């Protein structure tokens, strides 16, 4: 039913999606997560098609600061304290910024260590960067931190792409059983943030 973290990280390293579940007492949601450096146009289209469509790109604070991407607001009133930064698009090779091609390109360039100039991105845009806590899931058990921790475990640039799964029949958020069924249908491994936390603790 649930994959081991080792199996999940291997898939993640190969550029495959994972479904990551948080605790039922938290958001009780499953996010599709993929490494930012790997995401293709086709995968971005899949992500948008089966999710809320509000694609976010978690990354380290160091990466955000190096690209001079500020936080969206000074006073964060989000219930889960999700750390939204100013939206953006990659400046070269995109048109409106909203297409699967453009969003995938922007995400890959955010993950590209050779892209170092803030001027390479236009703001506002259609990708929502998220600032992960430095301590990862051990500091905050959110999908933001899970995405960055998975990148680190896979030896990839610490930039992911995430979006919440929704049910096709009614558009409501996918819960545990929905996520398990979706993963089985599409061959996507499912893990929990709790198991990721335990795995990371075991490596310390």
UniProtKB/Swiss-Prot annotation:
GO CC term, one of those recorded: cytosol
Modified residues (S-glutathionyl cysteine): 56
Residues the entry annotates as binding Mg(2+) 2: 27, 143
Cofactor binding, per record: Binds 2 divalent metal cations per subunit. Magnesium or manganese.
Annotated Pfam families: DHBP_synthase
Binding sites annotated in the UniProt record for D-ribulose 5-phosphate: 31, 82, 140-144
Binding site for Mg(2+) 1: 27
The protein's role, per its UniProt record: Catalyzes the conversion of D-ribulose 5-phosphate to formate and 3,4-dihydroxy-2-butanone 4-phosphate.
Name of the protein in its database record: 3,4-dihydroxy-2-butanone 4-phosphate synthase
């Amino acid at each position: 039913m649930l994959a081991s973290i080792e199996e999940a990280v291997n898939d993640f390293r190969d550029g495959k999606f994972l479904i990551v579940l948080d605790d039922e007492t938290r958001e009780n949601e499953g996010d599709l997560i993929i490494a930012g450096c790997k995401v293709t146009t086709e995968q971005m289209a899949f992500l948008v098609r089966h999710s809320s469509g509000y694609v976010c790109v978690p990354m380290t604070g160091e990466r955000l600061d190096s690209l001079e991407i500020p936080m969206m607001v000074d006073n964060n009133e989000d219930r889960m304290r999700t750390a939204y930064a100013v939206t953006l698009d990659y400046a070269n090779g995109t048109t409106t910024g909203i297409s699967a091609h453009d969003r995938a390109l922007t995400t890959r360039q955010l993950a590209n260590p050779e892209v170092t100039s803030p001027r390479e991105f236009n703001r506002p845009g259609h990708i929502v960067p998220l600032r992960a806590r430095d301590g990862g899931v051990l500091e905050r058990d959110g999908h933001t931190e899970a995405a960055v921790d998975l990148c680190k475990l896979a030896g990839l640039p610490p930039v992911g792409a995430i979006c919440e799964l929704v049910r096709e029949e009614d558009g409501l958020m996918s819960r545990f059983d929905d996520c398990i069924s979706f993963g089985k249908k599409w061959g996507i491994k499912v893990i929990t943030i709790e198991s990721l936390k335990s795995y990371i603790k075991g490596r310390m």
